[in-house]
Amino acid sequence: MRQWLLLKDILRTGWVRAGVESPESVAAHSWGMSVLAMHLCPDSLDKMRVIEMCLVHDLPEIEVGDLTPHDDTSTKSEDEHRAMARLAPQWLDLFEEYEAQETEEAKFVKYLDKLDMALMARIYEEKQGLDLSEFITSARKVIGETNLK
């Protein structure tokens, strides 16, 4: 159990690379997604499952690290699956559901993942005067234009 809390100490690699001062941790990102889920989850979805998926989808990063498109991700899927099986086998089904992107809940969690990133990019841009448009562009590929005004 204690190892799960290490997610609080892992900084989001993309923000570090972009020069963000005091970037959020991976755990803060998961929390942000969960709060967005509580507010935005459609009634047609299983809200508890969505929130649970938000909370555990990045747990493997405790062992694998927070990889970005700039990293070698050729073994990311396998590495993360093995890490999740070791760290929290009781939540492996949630992780696999998220990774497969076949259920509406998993697709919504992916949407929240990108929405949280885009919202944080805007916050960091406003507070720190950075150009984080690459993050907004990346998010738009998943969530569309209308949600990022």
Task: List each language-model region with its residue ranges.
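Active-site helical microenvironments for divalent-metal-assisted chemistry
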Residues: 1-149
